[in-house]
A protein has these predicted regions:
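Short, well-ordered loop/turn elements at secondary-structure boundaries
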Residues: 39-41, 105-106
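Conserved thiamine diphosphate
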Residues: 1-36
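Generic beta-sheet signal
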Residues: 42-46, 109-111
Length: 152
């Protein structure tokens, strides 16, 4: 028997810059997580938990009470300087996100990690711009053709 994977820990380690968890029965919360992920410039991932109708027959039948424990929302730091704020979750800390990911299933819901940094597209754009400046805006096609001529 092996230890099950922890997708949230893997996401923190992978370098995703927005990581959140929500539940399919909490539509307002899920919508807010999707909104924040869409507005985040960079790689965003949301883990959406849901009752499984395969292993839990009747999970979505009308009037059937939901199972699976509490829906505990992460209390995010607001940086207002109050002592209470220091006890809250810092979404910019990978260490804090890793600790949240360690909480027993189903854990807490909300934003685990959010860090602003240049996206892949921004980094590529800057690389292309810098390269063009270094080559005095030379025609890329001509440079490639010249390079291949030298290989014949």
């Amino acid at each position: 028997m092996d230890i099950p994977d922890n997708p949230m820990k893997k996401l923190v380690a992978s370098g995703a810059s927005f990581i959140a968890r929500t539940h399919s029965t909490q539509v307002k919360h899920m919508t807010e997580m999707f909104r924040r992920a869409i507005q985040h410039p960079g790689f965003s991932v949301i883990e959406v938990l849901s009752e499984c109708p395969v292993f839990y027959k009747g999970a979505f039948d009308d009037g059937n009470p939901r199972k699976g424990g509490e829906f505990e929302i992460i209390d995010e730091k607001t940086s207002d300087g109050t002592p209470e704020d220091n006890e809250k979750h810092d979404v910019t800390s990978e260490t804090a996100a890793f600790a949240l990911a360690d909480i027993q299933y189903p854990g807490k819901f909300g934003v685990f990690y959010q860090k602003e940094r240049p996206s892949k597209n921004d980094l590529e754009g800057n690389l292309i711009k810098t390269s063009r400046e270094k080559s005095n805006n030379a025609d890329a096609r001509k440079l490639i053709e010249e390079r291949f001529k030298g290989m014949r």
